[in-house]
Amino acid sequence: MPVSMAVCETANVVNAALRESLGGNSSAGSSTDQAKSGEDTNGSLQNHIVANAKRILMAKIEYEEVPNYHESVLENLKSKYIVIKPGNPGAINGFSGKNNTGKLVGANGHDNNGARKQAEHPNNQSHHINHHNHQHPTSNPNELPKPKRVLYPRENIRIGWKQSERKWQVGTGMINVGNTCYLNSTLQALLHIPALANWLVSEQAHLADCNVAEPGSGCIICAMTKTLLATQSNQSAVRPFLIYSKLKQICKHMVVGRQEDAHEFLRFLVEAMERAYLMRFRNYKELDQLVKETTPLGQIFGGYLRSEVRCLSCNHVSITFQHFQDLLLDIRKADSLEDAFEGHFSRERLEDMGYKCEGCKKKVSATKQFSLERAPITLCIQLKRFSMIGNKLTKQISFKSRIDLSKYAARSQAAQAQPLTYRLVSMVTHLGASQHCGHYTAIGSTDTGSFYNFDDSYVRPIAMHSVCNTNAYIMFFELDLSQAASPAANRPNGVRLTNGHSTTPVPAATVSSPSPTRFIGPQLPAGGANGYTNGNAQKTAIQFKQQNQQSPQNGLQLGTGKFQDTAKPPLVGAHAKGEATSAPTANGNKSSSPSSNSSSNHKSINQQQYLPISSDDEDIEDEMKPRPTTAQLPSMPNMTENHTEPKAKSPVKIQVKTPVKTPLKSLVPYESASEEEEAPLPNPRKRPSGEDSSESDQESGQTNGHSKTNGSHTNGSASSSVHVNNSKQKTDAIDEIFKSLKKSADSDEDDDEEEPSIQLTNGWHPQKQSQSQSKAPPSPKTPPSPAVIKSKTGIWKVTRNDEVDAIEDDVDVVVVEGSPVKIPTPNKNHRNPFSSSKPSTDSPATPGAKRQKLLNGSALKSHQQPRVGNGYQSNATSNGSTINELLKQSYRGYGSPVLSWNGKPAELEKELLVDAREQRQRDIDDDEENEMDRGRQRKVKSGSAKGNNASNSTPGYNPFQEYEGQKRWNKNGGGGGFPRFYNQNYRQNFQQRNKFKFNRFGGPGSAKFQQQRALQRHLSAGGGFSRRQPSAQQQQQT
C-alpha cells in the first residue's frame, strides 16, 4: 500500500490506545487503587504502543509509482494550504525535480540541504536528464551534455533580415570622438548581423521596464538597442555616447581616448551583454556554466568544438567539448580562408611524452584534432594578424562570400543532418602597420544583399569583388537557411549556369548552339589566319545568348603556324542552326554561306572590352578591311599581273614587282565582312569602309605601318581576291592624296641637295625600279591610285616616265626612278624604327624624286643626322605644309592612327601620347631651370652660315656673355695666365662654366672634350646644325 496510508493507520492505532487507557483510569474509586491502576495503565499503554509500533514496522509497505508528484501529493496538500509560489522551479523546461536519491532538487542543481548535485559532472554515470517524461539512468560521455535549464531557446533566434517585420535601412555612420574607430567599426559590424539585430529589436519590451543596473551605469543591452534604433532612424551620423560612456563598465583597463584592439573590445562587449542578461535572474550567480551558455548571445555566437586526443600507444581516445564564440585562425601558412580552416581542423601532434593517457596511466605521445560538434548561428572569425610584440601580418587572405564547413563537422548523425553553409554579413578591417597605430573600418550587408563600407561617419557602397579583396581582420558569417533547406548539389565538370544566376545546370557546349554536330579540336576562325573573326563570333568572351549567325570558332586560334591564346580559352563558340548543312572546309570548320549580313545585326558581347593581341609574326596577317559585298571563296592566290579590271583615265602605268619567294597557302581561304564596317573613320586619310580590298592589311606584309622583309625581298603573299569598288569615297580619298603630293612638290622647289626619299603611303620602303621598267607602256585600264597597291599578286608600284613628268599639272603622281631592282635595308632608329638614315647616292637627284614625301608619318631619307626630338628626318629649311600635316599625325612612325576593334584609339597609342606629353613637360621644365640658372645674358645675333666666322662658330656660343663673365671673374685683378676673351678656349668652356669656374683649360685635349660636351647638350636640347656644319666641325677640330 502507499506510504501515506501506512502512516495514517499507525496514527489511528495510537489514538485508540490512548483513549482506552484514559477511559480505564476514570473508573477507579480509591486513591490506592488509583495509584495501582495508574501504574498498570502506564504499563499497558507502553505495551500497546510498543506492540503497535512493532506491528507497523513489521508490516510490508508497498510503493506505487505516480505519473507526477504534483498530481499525487502536492495537489492534495493544496486543498489544505495556501499556495504562495506556484509551481516548482526544479520542474521548469521539462526537467525533473528529483535526483536519483529521491530528494527534491532546486533549479540550479542543488538539493534542499544545499548539497551539490552529484550528477552535475558530464562524465558522472548517475547524471539524470528527463526531457521526455522518463528517466535516463546514464549519459554518454562522448556526447555533448545538455544543460538543466535553458535561459533563451535556440529556436527563438531569427536568422536573416527577412525574418523580422521591420524594414531595415542601411544605417548611418558613427562620429569618431577621439581614437574610437575601433569602437565604431565593431559596433557597425555587430549591428549588421541579422540575428543580433533581430534580437535587440525584440528587447524593446525589456527596454520599457528595465531595472537591471550595474554599479555606476545602466544596462548595456539597452544601450545597444538604443544605438541600433538611432542608426536606423537618423539621417546623419550618430554619436555612440551610450556605449562610449560605459567603456569602463565593458572593460576596466580600457582608457578613453586611447587606441584599442577591435577584437579585444568585441570580446569584452559581448561578455558585458551576457552579464547584463544574466542579471535579470535572482540566482544567476548559482547557475552552472552550461546554463549560462544558453543566453541569447551564447545562442547566437556560441558553438562547441569537439576535441579528440588519441594516444599513439594504446589508441585510447579522449573526447572533450569546448565552448567557443569565435575562431582564431592562423594565417602564417595560409593564403586563403579555406587553407586556414584546413590548418585549424587538421590533426596535429602534441609534444612528445607530454600527454598523460587515461588508459596507459602514463605520459605518452598523442595527436589532437578539432571538429565542430555544434556550429554557431553566427560564426565569428578572427585572423591572427598581430603578434605578441605588436607586429602585423599584412598578407592578403582570399575568401568567398559563402563558405561550407560541412566537412569539419563532427561525425555524428545530428551534426551531419544539417549542412553548414554560411554567408558573409559583416567584417572589420584594419589599415596600418602595427596594432599600436592604424585605422579600423567596417563592412556590413543589408537586406537587399548589397554591402556598404562604414568609415566612421562616412558610408559608401562597395562592390562584392572589392569586399572579397579586402584585407580583413574580423569576419562574421551567418548560417544560410536557404542552403540548409535545399543543399547545393555537386555540379559535374563541363556544366555551368546559363546566365550566371540561374541554378539550372546547362552543359557549356550547348549554351549558345542547338546544333548537335560539333567539331572537337583546334579550329581556325573565319576571316583571318591569326584568330580574328569577321562575324559575330567571340574570341575571348563567353556568349550566352543564341544567335542566328555562325562562326566555326571554338576558342583556339592558329596564327602563322603556332597556337595563340589571347586571354582565356572560350568555353563556347557561336554556331548557326543550319551548320549541319553547310559545307566543311579543308581544316574541319564549317563555312559561312549567309555571311553578308553577319556584322550588321549583332556585335560580339565582349569585343569592345578586349583589345586584339598579336605577336610580330602574326602582324603580317592581322586585320581584314571591311567589304560591302558578300564573302568570296577564292582558291590559291593567282600570281598573274592582269587581275584587276578598273577603268583608266590617266597615262599612269602600274608595274608589278612579283616576289621571288613563293607565297604560302592561306590556311583560311574564305573571308566575310568585318564588324568594323559601320565604324566611322576619324582620320580623313584612312581609306573608307568601302575601299578596294586590295589594300587589306591582313594580306599584305605590314600591319599598322610595320614593314616586314625576309632578306632582300618583301614577302607579299596574299590570300584575298581583288575587288574593285568605284565609289565616290574612294575617289575623294585618292584626290586628297594627290593634293597633298602636289603641295609637297610646290614646297620643295628650292631644295637642291636632298636625296630622294623613297617612302610610300603607309611606311613601306619600296624597291627601286630600273629605267627600262619605267619605260613600259602604261595600262589603259588603270585608275588613279595611291603610291602603292597591295594585292594577291604582290606589291604594285606607281611610277611615271618623262612623258608623265611633262604633264605634271594634269595628273599628280609620284615618280620613282633609280637603279636596278633592290630593296635597301634601312637603318633602325630607336625613336622611329621605320625611318632610314642611310644616305642614297646611287642615283642623281631629280625633281620628281624630290617630291616624294612623307604621307603617313614615315621618315625622310637624308644624309643629315636625325632630329632627336620627334624622330623625323627633314631638311632644316623645309617648312612645307606636308611636314606640318605630318607633325599633326602619329609621331612614332605608325602612319595614320591605328584604331582598335571597337573603333577607339589603341592602348599603345594612348601610352605614346602620354609619353610625348610628359616629355614635352620635362623639356619645358628643363628650359625653365636652364633659364633660371643662366641668369642675365647679353643679346647676340645668331651666326650666319655664309659669314666669315661660320667655320669658327660654336652652336649657342655667345662671345659677349663670355666677355662679361670674364670681367666678373677677374674684377679683383690677378688671374695672371687667363687668355683674352676671343680665345677659342672660352668658347669651349662656356657650357661647363658652373662646373669648371676657375679652371680654364688651354690644351688641345681639354678643348676637344669641352666642345663635345657642348655639342651633346645642344643636341639634347633639340638644336640642329646648318647644312655645312660637318665641315665647320672638321675645321675646328684641326
From Swiss-Prot:
PANTHER family: UBIQUITIN CARBOXYL-TERMINAL HYDROLASE, UBIQUITIN CARBOXYL-TERMINAL HYDROLASE 36. Hydrolase that deubiquitinates polyubiquitinated target proteins including imd. Required for preventing the constitutive activation of the imd/NF-kappa-B (Imd) signaling cascade under unchalleneged conditions. Deubiquitinates imd linked 'Lys-63' chains which leads its proteasomal degradation and consequently down-regulation of the Imd signaling cascade. Removal of the activating 'Lys-63'-linked chains is likely to enable their replacement with 'Lys-48'-linked chains which act as 'tags' the for proteasomal degradation of imd. It catalyses: Thiol-dependent hydrolysis of ester, thioester, amide, peptide and isopeptide bonds formed by the C-terminal Gly of ubiquitin (a 76-residue protein attached to proteins as an intracellular targeting signal). Residues 777-786 have a biased composition (Pro residues). GO terms for cellular component: cytosol; nucleolus; nucleoplasm; nucleus. Disruption phenotype: Mutants are lethal at larval stages. They are significantly smaller without gross morphological defects and die 5 days after egg laying. Cells show accumulation of ubiquitinated proteins in both the nucleus and the cytoplasm, forming dense dots. Double mutants for ref(2)P and scny die 96 hours after egg laying. RNAi-mediated knockdown is also larval lethal. RNAi-mediated knockdown in the fat body or gut of uninfected adults, results in a significant increase in the expression of the antimicrobial peptide genes Dpt, AttA and puc. The modification Phosphothreonine is found at T658, T662, T782, T825, T846. Residues 172-480 form the USP domain. Residues 22-44, 107-148, 487-794, 818-881, 912-985, 1000-1038 are annotated as: Disordered. Residues 729-746, 912-923 have a biased composition (Basic and acidic residues). Belongs to the peptidase C19 family. This is Ubiquitin carboxyl-terminal hydrolase 36. One of its GO terms (molecular function) is cysteine-type deubiquitinase activity. The lineage of its organism: Eukaryota, Metazoa, Ecdysozoa, Arthropoda, Hexapoda. Keywords: Cytoplasm, Hydrolase, Nucleus, Phosphoprotein, Protease, Thiol protease, Ubl conjugation pathway. The modification Phosphoserine is found at S513, S515, S672, S674, S747, S779, S785, S819, S843. Residues 502-517, 546-559, 587-606, 766-776, 942-953 have a biased composition (Low complexity). It is an enzyme of class 3 (hydrolase). It comes from the Eukaryota. Residues 23-44, 629-641, 703-728, 832-844, 859-881 have a biased composition (Polar residues). Residues 747-756 have a biased composition (Acidic residues). Its main location: nucleus. Interacts with atms/PAF1, but not with CycT. Interacts (via C-terminus) with imd (via N-terminus). GO terms for biological process: germ-line stem cell population maintenance; heterochromatin formation; negative regulation of antimicrobial peptide production; negative regulation of innate immune response; negative regulation of macroautophagy; negative regulation of peptidoglycan recognition protein signaling pathway; positive regulation of proteasomal protein catabolic process; protein deubiquitination.
